[in-house]
Curated annotation (Swiss-Prot):
Name under which the protein is recorded: Ferredoxin--nitrite reductase, chloroplastic
Pfam family name, one: NIR_SIR_ferr
NCBIfam families: PRK09566.1 (NF007125)
Organism encoding this protein: Betula pendula (European white birch)
One of the record's GO molecular function terms: metal ion binding
Induction per the UniProt record: By nitrate.
Domain of life: Eukaryota
Matching InterPro entries: NIR_SIR_4Fe-4S, NiRdtase/SiRdtase_haem-b_fer, Nit/Sulf_reduc_fer-like_dom_sf, NO2/SO3_Rdtase_4Fe4S_dom, NO2/SO3_Rdtase_4Fe4S_sf, NO2/SO3_Rdtase_FeS/sirohaem_BS
């Protein structure tokens, strides 16, 4: 087991909608009880450490879900910690599929290493998810990822995710040991990025360059990622959580990080003249329930962000339920214990068992209008600008990545920044170089800094092209529907449209102005067809709120007229024929 070596020092970072019709509730806004009646035995930790790994105690194994049984059958992290991936990579898929354990290794346990087998749609091919704290990557890292996917031809591509991360596709198992080595050499890891682990820490994509930033989030997210993965060597204390767990550090009034949908969100706040963070906990999406994060009534100094993260993770790991998989996210535990009961369990796990109450207010301006990241914008550094590029539904090819890396080196500082809207920012560009950058073919032909207004806010998950859980195809359909809608109506203000292929909501439809969640529907003849549930009214920024279900089971072929109608009624869009007649 690797030892953890992280210095918990905070750098000097601090510086000074319409009402929607509701046909169904998309999110749970109910506040957990302050105190809940809980039997003392319920507070006994359900896991214990054995030979360096955290294991579910035998007395708590009745009624556990299949994934928990799989973890007990073989510890997933042994594939990384004890070289199991090397042996697995030498086996043929035929050999692997003949053995129950090996088959579950490639289908489930490899997710602890960030590898997802696409058995249903691309047998023998894997998606690899990285860790990219705060969404920052270098040109060298980008070139390496391009070299990986290029060898896979039409099966190889990469996606920008809604957690400021890279996912690369087309990977074959025999290449994995060499890929992992290459990732390490360029300062990347895929470790602990899937299944019951902490996902990529999200922050302000403008950290350190933002004219209006409250605090630079990048150093904090780097610390969080180093802690969570033990400097990319594996932190076994947090690889057996009841379910996945999301964290973000908020750095500006814009709330680019979407704190209301994270399990833990650090909200900048001053208390007694000291800079630190108020804490929100419990936000999540799932097919069963969507819940907005709630205040923990806790404040920590900037020096203590790791300590409180550790305490919250330990409370969740120790006490979270492991039965029905749809009721294992941290908010279910908060509901069961009550917010004060959960807080007390966190306090027990803090040094000296102390945790200050929240500052009266955080530093977020409540009436702040969220800024646009796409386009050319000045930085806080005189003479420098950043350029936000629109990446249509987040999809890039190997040649695109090489070109992006070249642009980052030629015009910037060799750095790219990914956003939760699946776009990319090139920072630190000398103003004298802007004209040349804007004239580059890649920006003219592929990744525009001035996309059409409806394309600008378009987000889409992987869809059933690659994902076995997706019910519908999303990326190509999102582009096609949006293109057709643009031909029919003129829109004068941004409208964010998100697509997700299934109720897991990787496309985060509940935060969109208009969201589309894949489902099976019935056409005019009553026959099953691909469809979508439509959501309206999601808000982001300082007035964040989850949207509501507007209409169920709309056949995909009927979405264009519905979207046109919504845009005209709720967003001031004008039909093209009317616009032309008025002109």
């Amino acid at each position: 087991m690797s030892s953890l070596s992280v210095r918990f020092l905070s750098p000097p970072l601090f510086s000074s909608t319409p009402a929607w019709p509701r046909t169904g509730l998309a999110a749970t806004q109910a506040v957990p009880p302050v105190v809940a009646e809980v039997d003392a035995g319920r507070l006994e930790p359900r896991v214990e450490e054995r030979e360096g790994y955290w294991v579910l105690k035998e007395k708590f194994r009745e009624g556990i879900n299949p994934q928990e049984k799989l973890k007990l059958e073989r510890e997933p992290m042994k594939l990384f910690m004890e070289g199991g991936i090397e042996d697995l990579a030498k086996m043929s898929l035929e050999e692997i599929d003949k053995d129950k354990i090996s088959k579950s290794d490639i289908d489930v346990r490899l997710k602890w290493l960030g590898l997802f087998h696409r058995r249903k749609h691309h047998y023998g091919r894997f998606m690899m998810r990285l860790k990219l704290p705060n969404g920052v990557t270098t040109s060298a890292q980008t070139r390496y990822l391009a070299s990986v996917i290029r060898k896979y031809g039409k099966d190889g591509c990469a996606d920008v995710t809604t957690r400021q991360n890279w996912q690369i596709r087309g990977v074959v198992l025999s290449d994995v040991p060499e890929i992992l080595k290459g990732l390490d050499e360029v300062g990347l890891t895929s470790l602990q990025s899937g299944m019951d682990n902490v996902r990529n820490p999200v922050g302000n994509p403008l950290a350190g360059i933002d004219i209006h930033e409250i605090v630079a989030t990048r150093p904090y997210n780097n610390l969080l990622s180093q802690f969570i993965t033990a400097n990319s060597r594996g932190n076994l204390a947090f690889t057996n959580l009841p379910r996945k767990w999301n964290v973000c550090v908020v750095g500006s009034h814009d709330l680019f990080e979407h704190p209301h949908i994270n399990d833990l969100a650090y909200m900048p706040a001053i208390k007694d003249g000291r800079f630190g963070f108020n804490l929100l906990v419990g936000g999540f999406f799932s097919p069963r329930r969507c819940a907005e994060a709630v205040p923990l009534d806790a404040w920590v100094s900037a020096d203590d962000i790791i300590l409180v993260c550790k305490a919250i993770l330990e409370a969740y790991r120790d006490l979270g339920t492991r039965g029905n998989r749809q009721k294992t996210r941290m908010m279910w535990l908060i509901d069961e214990l009550g917010i004060e009961g959960f807080r007390s369990e966190v306090v027990k796990r803090m040094p000296n068992q102390e945790l200050e109450r929240a500052a009266p207010e955080d530093l977020i301006e409540k009436q702040w209008e969220r800024r646009e990241l796409i386009g050319v914008h000045p930085q806080k550094q005189e003479g420098l600008s950043y350029v936000g590029l629109h990446i249509p539904v987040g999809r890039v090819q190997a040649d695109d990545m090489d070109e992006l890396a070249r642009l980052a080196d030629t015009y910037g500082c060799g750095e790219l920044r990914l956003t939760v809207e699946q776009n990319i920012i090139i920072p630190n560009i000398e103003n004298s170089k802007l004209e040349a950058l804007l004239g580059e073919p890649l920006l003219k032909d592929r990744f525009s800094p001035e996309p059409p207004i409806l394309m600008k806010g378009l987000v889409a998950c992987t869809g059933n092209q690659f994902c076995g859980q997706a019910i519908i195809e999303t990326k190509a359909r999102a582009l096609k529907v949006t293109e057709e809608v643009q031909r029919q109506v003129a829109v004068t203000r941004p409208v964010r449209m998100h697509w997700t292929g299934c109720p897991n909501s990787c496309g985060q439809v509940q935060v969109a102005d208009i969201g589309f969640m894949g489902c099976m529907a019935r056409d005019e003849n009553g026959k099953p067809c691909e469809g979508a549930a439509v959501f309206l009214g999601g808000r982001i920024g300082s007035d964040s709120h989850l949207g509501n279900l507007y209409k169920k089971g709309v056949p995909c072929k009927n979405l264009v007229p519905l979207v046109v109608d919504i845009l005209v009624k709720h967003f001031g869009a004008v039909p093209r024929e009317r616009e032309e007649s008025e002109d």
